[in-house]
UniProtKB/Swiss-Prot annotation:
Entry superkingdom: Eukaryota
Membrane topology: Multi-pass membrane protein
Cellular localisation: Mitochondrion inner membrane
Protein name: NADH-ubiquinone oxidoreductase chain 1
Similarity field: Belongs to the complex I subunit 1 family.
InterPro entries: NADH_UbQ_OxRdtase_su1/FPO, NADH_UbQ_OxRdtase_su1_CS
Organism this protein belongs to: Alligator mississippiensis
EC number of this enzyme: 7.1.1.2
Chief location bin: mitochondrion
Keyword Transport set for record: yes
Encoding gene (name): MT-ND1
Catalytic activity: a ubiquinone + NADH + 5 H(+)(in) = a ubiquinol + NAD(+) + 4 H(+)(out)
Gene Ontology biological process terms, A to Z: aerobic respiration
Keywords: Electron transport, Membrane, Mitochondrion, Mitochondrion inner membrane, NAD, Respiratory chain, Translocase, Transmembrane, Transmembrane helix, Transport, Ubiquinone
Listed transmembrane segments: 6-26, 67-87, 103-123, 143-163, 174-194, 220-240, 256-276, 296-316
Length: 321
């Protein structure tokens, strides 16, 4: 293998991990200000080095395995979670994707579905009833909300004319799809909150019920891997939301401007994730499921039929001259 072929993926991975580190600092700062306190402000200027101190602490701690755990799956689950979270960035145009695929959207949906295996493995291999119940909740929640995500993606494909993420950037040169499909965007954004197990849908870690959920038995570096995977998924989902609904136009002469515009919009969406966490209480589990199956599913199916039927009905009209 040519050594130059390793450089772009390595740069992408390092950039994602650095972004995750500063995202955790940003979250703690925003949560602090919303709760009328300062947040981290000791380690480094303005507390910016706090994530690196936390990471160093977790890496240097001793790895402890529960006595009755299944060691192979126990270690494999967080590793698989982080590997999948990093691999899902490959088809995203920023501005040039690492893997320019014709079915990039389908690949992202398929790989996000594989994340449930890491949740299930971690809960089952921990041999703890709290971890297993948290894993079952996470799996049910993730699989359920992927139904809505898939239907909304189908609606976007009908409007853009292709499964390629590059096609979406070309389609949105004259007009953002968010303006034409704002109900779908609102449901997509809410579904990404549930897909990433974020508040107010963080049912996997109810402190009074399941303590920390599927990762309750984890500590040291495996816990850090789960933590990195969670925040990498948050940034990925918001970057995908930007590409689907708010994509900058195709870069022609300054690709750096495309990247800056894309990541600025993704950062604003990510900050609204943190705003939602500070503002809303946790849903009950039955409310979470009713929201999807009784509200989002009928609405997304109706919008999908609307997006497919309106263009076909226009074909029968006489030419507008």
């Amino acid at each position: 293998m040519d050594s130059l072929t390793i450089v772009p993926p390595a740069l992408l991975i390092i950039s994602i991990l650095m972004a995750v580190a500063f995202l955790t600092a940003l979250e703690r700062k925003i949560m602090g200000h919303m709760q009328l306190r300062k947040g981290p402000n000791i380690v480094g200027p303005l507390g910016l080095l706090q994530p690196f101190a936390d990471g160093l602490k977790l890496i240097t701690k001793e790895l402890t395995l529960p006595l009755l755990a299944t060691p192979t799956l126990f270690i494999l689950a967080p590793t698989a979670a982080l590997m999948l979270a990093l691999a899902m960035w490959s088809p995203l145009p920023m501005p040039s994707p690492l893997a320019d695929l014709n079915l990039g959207l389908l690949l992202l949906l398929a790989m996000s579905s594989l994340m449930v295996y890491s949740f299930l493995w971690s809960g089952w291999s921990s041999n703890s009833k709290y971890a297993l119940m948290g894993a079952m909740r996470a799996v049910a929640q993730t699989i359920s909300y992927e139904v809505t995500l898939a239907i909304i993606v189908l609606s976007i494909v009908l409007l853009s004319g292709g499964f390629s993420l590059h096609t979406l950037t070309v389609t949105q040169e004259p007009l953002y799809l968010a303006l034409a499909t704002w109900p779908s965007m609102m449901m997509w954004y809410t579904s990404t909150l549930a897909e990433t197990n974020r508040a107010p849908f963080d049912l996997t870690e109810g402190e009074s019920e399941l303590v920390s959920g599927f990762n309750v038995e984890y500590s040291a570096s495996p816990f850090a891997l789960f933590f990195l995977a969670e925040y990498a998924n948050i940034m990925l989902m918001n970057t995908l939301t930007t590409t689907l609904f708010l994509s900058p136009s195709t870069p022609t002469f300054l690709p750096a401007l495309f990247t800056i515009a894309l990541m600025s919009k993704a950062l604003l969406l990510t900050m609204s994730f943190l705003w939602v966490r500070a503002s809303y209480p946790r849903f009950r589990y039955d409310q979470l499921m009713h929201l999807l199956w009784k509200n989002f599913l009928p609405m997304t199916l109706t919008l999908c039929l609307w997006h497919s039927s309106v263009p076909m009905s226009m074909f029968g009209l006489p030419p507008m001259t």
